[in-house]
From Swiss-Prot:
It is a lipid-anchor. Belongs to the MG307/MG309/MG338 family. Its main location: membrane. Transmembrane segments: none annotated. Residues 995-1014 are annotated as: Disordered. The keyword Signal applies. This is Uncharacterized lipoprotein MG309. GO terms for cellular component: plasma membrane. Pfam families: DUF3713. It comes from Mycoplasma genitalium (strain ATCC 33530 / DSM 19775 / NCTC 10195 / G37).
Length: 1225
């Protein structure tokens, strides 16, 4: 305490004005001594670990996005200050003075507010609450505030004016360019971003525009490169209510009150007598003059707005937000047109149309001949590849799903077109129609498609990439030409040089600013550095801006590598995020159609069609649509001073692989640039101000030491409370735990042969964790279905799906992420449960299991008994009902295969629909009627247990084959049921012996003796008291009951849950007498050594089946309990069938756990809960997911850390992380 009081007498680092104010304040009031005692004492390092050093923490700060922004802002501000200080515009100079004045006043007001609120403690609160977070002292607070004002003001000035002009080589900027001049494609290189009336040889106010215009130009370069923006000319014909009513198209018995929508897309027919320019008549005019809207000279596309149901015009589609902003069908169709212009189209029907059907209903353009359910698609790499399913055969789909319907989905012409299932007149005709969602249109057979006709949720769109024919070609995207074209359109709108019938609103630099605002300072630095490197003349050569220019060059020399590497990394990450939205938004688009199938209302999908874009079965990405995004990555990579790549990617790699390789490669560049920069600054720790609780740093080796030191401190402030830095501390515990490292390779995240377990054993833990994560995903179909495209097996491979999910986490690279710490915590819990001969697992299970209630290992699957299986043909099932339903109705296949051992290929349509194949997956999965996707979670047993084999398997003597059983829920107790359905949980714990079982006569389906295999002596009460283990344990339990409430609980469990007719217990007697009576009942009824006469006497009390109440029950539980599947009756709950397999365990089983439990060569399953090794490890894996077990394990990790708790030297970090992980220096 004495030393600390001495330290707080250090002088506060203030300006001369602040010093006088501080003296007056101290004279008026002194802080409370307890307030001072409670202050955190900063040290000279952030933690006592190597990665807690000053430099290591600064590395983290400058790799962190917010930390980098804070740092670069303070480095940018002094550069811009030179622009303000030497400016000839008095208004700009005055702005700088105003910033300083406003900042001074703001500080005074803030200080007074704290004085009023905290009185004597206000100086402490000023330091801890305000100054510690803003550079450490008053001078830095003010410098930071002024710097932020300078940066904000300069950026606002950047976009005040529109500098897009036509620049004649002879006369300069034309004040009023002619329409014909700028529409000439050969003149587009004269359209520039250039300020008017500037003169580099004079000191003029107007010369400031040269600064703004030059920076605008570079920001536009960034925008065009990073966003790949394309203007799309389009009109829409919105969905209509037909004049003759929906009932003439769709069956009103099935489709009640349809509304105009994508599914029920109907348009009124063309009427030659109607002079309207909207709807079908407008479409007729449009289709008759289609190619007149495409200018073959300058490649512009202008479609008259008058035909559109909305205002028409053009839309700017950008990589970052088009799938958020627009209908995903529309955005995907745009990409299709974009790729078609580069001959990279893979999605549209192979036939590219030169004309439209204009004399009928608009929708009929999407009815195509259906000689085959498959139509060829063009490949991006080879026009000879034709493998993609595209046409949607509605007749086939409805036929497969609606054999029980006596009426057609369609009526009138639609019925004729699609030859619906129950239409016998032409259902087998070769000329019935299928439906598509998109058509490519071209002028003639010798040209590329330049227009797209596409269906969307709001109507039908005719669209084309405006100018795409100019800057897109087979060799790719020409970014410079794309920029020229956008400037051409921007110049048109600026000067109103647009035909009145094709007007549109296009504010190019509003879009540029929107892109710029995402990363303002980093992008501005990048633009300034590009200007330094530019060969074109710009403001940097103006004598008027010499000081400003020199400061840009100086800071470029210091920050170039840092800015360039971080710029690339941020752009790569944003493009990756944008591309991920493709699968996500298309999944959202498809979900209602899948739901209709799942909910037995497939007819509600109406005219919905599969989008013509293939989903990669393995990754879930749409690789062809990803070409659009891959182009951005390539352009950004090539647009740097050091574009040499060590990436393993090839040009043919899909985006999903290329982006991962690029991010990994560039991450190393970021780390190297950050380390080099920080090390060169030779940062040191400086004394903390009075009352401060933080570490402050300083550098003398920068071109601007004061602002650089402030920048470093603000970067630290941003990162010290971040998850990333906290996770660095947490990770330190894991990587320094010797036992954990013996089990896990923490660098590669692979498993070692620890505790007799091999890699295959360890994978059970990995995939259990991933499956739990998979179940929590809102759109799991975005991870594909795990099917290898070269495989002939069309079943989903769940491990392949989980691998895709694991790859998306990118844990090997994200070492400070929450995802990694969560995975570490789980794996450590596994290791903690298994170490020391399973001591911790044993203790936890002893606490989890109870003597007084049964516990089970449970496998459970569920199915809607009325749910149709839309892929029944693929499953070779004649009926449309699900396999589970067929079994429940005792019409299972002749092999009598156990349902819980059948892999559910697509439970609850989790991978979409194979009938429609909405994701257009190359290897669609077969639908399953199972509701519960836990059917994908399987365990293996070695087949040695006779009760787990079917009769067929027994007769074939297949006792050594490893069997799979699906729907594993692990250890289930009455208080921990692991998401079991209510019906299953109630059957196990509140009606293990049901009244129907008890009252059923011999020969009834529920009485077990009549349904067992020959020689079976099982009873309906088998296992009822298995939790007690023996009669002796039951008597001990009764003896040890201390209260009436506990006795009542046991009594009610026996009589209500187990349906045992307990006799001889007078509930009005004392607790001791009731206990004695219950023990007498137990001894006389549950003792296997009693005489035959006693057993015969017991039959009169309906308790004749008590001889095996302490035996383990293992088998199927439904309306009956049986160990043989052939006699099993499913558990029913309203519309749901449940297939349940259960195995009892008790505390005696737990007591057997020990050193031999993990021995794969030991066939004695009694040492591992009577389970195979694989089943046992799956059980442990689920226990490791338990939050309570993880908490215990992490507490043990921290408590046993060989170096004790991590010591922290800065209050910001100490306050951010839980105190269980750290202590003060």
């Amino acid at each position: 305490m004495k030393r600390f009081l001495h330290r707080v007498k250090w002088p506060l680092l203030l300006s001369s004005i602040a010093v006088s104010l501080g003296i007056v304040a101290v004279a008026c009031a002194q802080p409370n001594s307890r307030t001072i005692e409670n202050l955190f004492r900063p040290s000279s390092a952030f933690t006592d670990k190597n990665d807690g050093s000053i430099n290591a923490t600064l590395y983290k700060a400058l790799e962190n996005r917010e930390g980098l922004t804070q740092y670069l802002t303070m480095r940018l501000a002094p550069v811009l200050r030179n622009f303000y200080e030497e400016n000839v515009d008095d208004d700009i100079k005055r702005n700088l003075r105003t910033f300083n004045t406003d900042t001074d006043n703001s500080f005074v007001n803030q200080e007074q507010n704290l004085r009023n609120q905290y009185r004597g403690d206000y100086l402490v609160r000023l330091q801890t609450d305000i100054l510690d977070n803003t550079g450490g002292n008053q001078a830095n607070w003010k410098l930071r505030d002024v710097n932020n004002k300078i940066v904000d003001d300069f950026i606002n000035k950047l976009f005040t004016k529109n500098f897009v002009e036509y620049v004649d080589k002879s006369v300069g900027v034309l004040s009023t360019p002619l329409k014909g001049l700028i529409e000439n494609q050969s003149n587009w290189n004269n359209i520039k971003i250039q300020a008017k009336f500037v003169d580099k040889n004079k000191r003029l106010r107007i010369n400031n525009d040269a600064v703004y215009a030059a920076i605008q130009d570079k920001l536009l370069d960034q925008f065009v490169t990073n966003e790949n923006p394309n203007l799309v000319s389009r009109v829409v014909f919105t969905n209509e209510t037909p004049n003759d009513g929906f009932d003439n198209y769709f069956n009103p018995d099935l489709i009640k009150s349809p509304t105009p929508s994508y599914q029920f897309q109907v348009f009124n027919k063309y009427n030659q007598q109607d002079n309207s320019i909207k709807g079908a008549n407008g479409f007729h005019i449009l289709a008759s003059n289609l190619q007149s809207y495409v200018n073959t000279n300058n490649k512009t596309i202008d479609i008259p707005n008058k035909f559109s149901s909305d205002s028409g015009g053009k839309l700017l589609l950008k990589a970052s937000d088009m799938f958020d902003t627009f209908d995903p069908s529309f955005s995907a169709a745009f990409i299709q047109g974009y790729l078609a212009l580069q001959k990279k189209s893979k999605g549209a029907e192979q036939t590219e149309y030169t004309k439209l059907e204009k004399d009928k209903s608009i929708i009929e353009n999407f009815f195509v001949e259906n000689n085959s359910a498959k139509a060829a698609m063009k490949s991006a790499s080879s026009s000879s590849q034709t493998t993609t399913v595209h046409k949607t055969d509605l007749a086939k789909i409805f036929k497969e799903n609606e054999t029980t319907k006596s009426t057609d989905v369609f009526k009138g012409e639609y019925q004729k077109k699609f030859s619906n299932a129950t239409s016998t007149s032409n259902s087998d005709s070769s000329n019935n129609s299928a439906i598509v969602d998109l058509k490519e249109l071209k002028k003639d057979n010798n040209s590329q498609p330049d227009l797209i006709l596409a269906r969307g949720k709001d109507g039908i769109h005719l669209m084309g990439v405006d100018g795409g024919g100019y800057y897109l070609s087979e060799s790719g995207r020409d970014v410079n030409k794309q920029k020229q074209f956008l400037l051409f359109r921007a110049l048109q709108t600026k000067y109103g040089l647009i035909d009145t019938n094709t007007t549109y609103d296009f504010k190019l630099f509003d879009e540029v600013k929107k892109h710029f605002d995402k990363n303002r300072v980093l992008f501005l630095f990048n633009a300034l550095f590009k200007l330094v490197d530019s060969k074109e003349s710009n403001f940097l050569s103006f004598p008027q801006f010499k000081k400003f220019s020199d400061s840009i060059i100086t800071v470029k020399n210091e920050l170039k590598d840092l800015v360039e590497s971080q710029y690339q990394q941020i752009v790569f990450n944003e493009v990756a995020t944008a591309e991920n939205k493709v699968a996500l938004k298309l999944a959202e688009r498809n979900q209602p159609f899948i739901d209709n199938e799942r909910n037995k209302q497939i007819w509600m999908n109406g005219l919905a069609a599969v989008l013509p874009y293939e989903q990669d079965s393995k990754t879930g990405h749409y690789n062809e649509l990803g070409i659009y995004y891959k182009d951005i990555i390539d352009k950004v990579s090539s647009n740097t001073s050091n574009s040499n790549s060590n990436s393993n990617s090839s040009s043919s790699d899909p985006f999903s692989k290329k982006i991962i390789d690029k991010l990994k490669e560039n991450k190393k560049k970021v780390e190297a640039a950050v380390k080099k920069h920080v090390d060169e600054l030779k940062v040191s720790v400086i004394p903390s101000p009075q009352y401060s609780q933080i570490i402050l740093v300083d550098t003398k080796l920068s071109s601007d030491p004061r602002n650089t030191s402030l920048a470093l401190n603000l970067a630290l402030n941003a990162v010290l409370s971040s998850d990333e830095l906290q996770n660095t501390i947490r990770r330190d515990y894991f990587v320094n735990d010797d036992q954990f490292k013996q089990a896990i390779d923490l660098d590669k995240l692979t498993f070692k042969n620890w505790n007799s377990l091999n890699n295959e054993n360890w994978n059970i833990f990995k995939y259990t964790y991933l499956f739990d994560l998979f179940q929590k995903q809102a759109n799991p179909s975005i991870f594909g279905n795990g099917v290898n495209e070269s495989s002939t097996d069309n079943k989903p491979k769940i491990n392949g799906v989980l691998d895709s999910l694991y790859n998306s986490l990118n844990l090997e690279e994200r070492l400070d992420s929450n995802d990694l710490i969560n995975y570490y915590s789980y794996l450590y819990t596994v290791q903690w449960l298994l170490k020391d001969n399973l001591k911790n697992l044993k203790q936890n299970l002893q606490a989890k299991l109870s003597r007084t209630t049964n516990s089970f290992l449970v496998w459970s699957l569920a199915s809607d008994k009325d749910r149709n299986n839309t892929a029944s043909q693929a499953m070779s099932v004649s009926s449309s009902k699900s396999v589970l339903v067929k079994m429940a109705n005792n019409v299972a296949s002749q092999t009598n295969q156990d349902f819980t051992k059948q892999e559910q290929q697509n439970p609850n349509y989790v991978f979409g629909s194979s009938a429609y194949n909405w994701t257009n997956n190359k290897t669609p999965t077969v639908n399953s009627a199972a509701n519960d996707i836990s059917s994908l979670y399987y365990t293996k047993n070695n087949g040695s247990s006779s009760t787990s084999l079917t009769l067929m398997q027994k007769s074939a003597q297949q006792t050594n084959n490893q069997q799979r059983r699906f729907g594993f829920h692990g250890i289930v107790t009455n208080t921990s049921s692991n998401n079991l359905p209510d019906a299953v949980r109630n059957r196990l714990f509140t009606s293990f012996v049901s009244q129907s079982e008890k009252s059923s006569s011999n020969g009834g389906q529920a009485q077990l003796q009549s349904t067992q295999s020959s020689g079976s002596n099982e009873t309906i009460y088998k296992g009822a008291l298995f939790s007690f283990g023996s009669l002796t344990k039951l008597i001990e339990t009764i003896d040890n009951i201390p209260t009436q409430a506990e006795f009542d609980a046991l009594y009610n469990h026996l009589t209500s849950n187990l349906n045992i007719n307990v006799t001889g217990v007078d509930r009005s007697k004392s607790l001791q007498e009731q206990k004695t009576n219950l023990k007498n009942f137990a001894n006389s009824n549950f003792n296997n050594t009693q005489t035959v006469q006693l057993k015969q006497a017991q039959s009169k009390t309906n308790n004749s089946n008590f001889n095996d109440v302490f035996s383990r029950f293992e088998g199927y539980i439904g309306t009956n309990k049986t160990s043989n599947y052939s006699s099993y009756n499913f558990l029913q709950d309203n519309q749901i069938y449940h297939a349940v397999y259960a195995k009892q365990i008790n505390l005696e089983d737990v007591s057997m756990l020990g050193s031999d439990s993990l021995n794969s060569t030991d066939s004695n399953n009694s040492k591992r809960l009577d389970l195979s090794l694989e089943e046992f490890l799956s059980t442990v894996a689920l226990e490791a997911l338990n939050p309570n077990n993880q908490t215990q394990a992490i507490n043990a990790l921290i408590a046993n850390a060989k170096n004790g708790l991590v010591r922290v030297g800065d209050n910001r970090l100490f306050s951010a992380i839980s105190s269980q992980w750290v202590r003060k220096f």
